[in-house]
Regions:
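Exported/extracytosolic protein signature
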Residues: 2-16, 22, 26-176
Length: 176
């Protein structure tokens, strides 16, 4: 019986507290105040722009009909936070298009960003992807993957991308 009274008392106290909270909010709003719950969120606008250099002239890939083997394409990933909250642990990923190969040491970013690479279509990323290589004696050894095996490049910034801030990342690929 004593347990039932305790439960009933807790229920009554909870209901009273809830009513006080609701009535306080209504009174505040009726007195000209505003009452809202706002959650700040990032809203990232990402664009990818490509450029090629021909005859010492830089051309947008949008203005080029075709690319030729041996030409280097310069990619820029532009990220802008148009929201009202910071994007923490922000990452941008660039794909290595079919028919091209990543140019070693070409990945750069504004700000302090870690650069990692994928050789499995973006499932995993590593600063130095490794593959298994069968040795002459039949054993298997882990060795660095060839740059030609890279399928994606990822940029991960240490600092958050704050509202109204922009970040750019760059990488090059060579047409096969």
């Amino acid at each position: 019986m004593n347990k039932n009274i305790n439960k009933a008392n807790r229920l009554v106290i909870g209901l009273i507290a809830g009513l006080l909270l609701v009535s306080s909010a209504v009174a505040f709003a009726n007195n000209g105040g505003s009452f809202s719950f706002v959650t700040a969120r990032p809203q990232i606008n990402v664009t990818l722009a490509g450029m090629i250099e021909r005859d010492s002239e830089k051309l947008s890939l949008e203005k080029v009909d075709a690319v030729k083997p041996g030409e280097v394409l310069h990619w820029t990933i532009k990220s802008e936070n148009e929201g009202d909250g910071a994007a923490k642990e922000y990452k941008a990923v660039g794909k290595i298009p079919a028919g091209t190969v990543f140019v070693a040491d070409s990945a750069k970013a504004e700000g302090k960003a870690a650069v990692t690479y994928s050789i499995d279509g973006g499932k995993t990323f590593s600063a130095q992807p490794m593959i298994e290589e069968k040795q002459a004696d039949g054993s298997v050894k882990m060795v660095p993957a060839q740059v030609s095996m890279y399928s994606q490049v990822r940029f991960e910034w240490e600092a958050p991308l704050n509202p109204n801030e922009k970040l750019n990342a760059f990488y090059d690929v060579k047409v096969k």
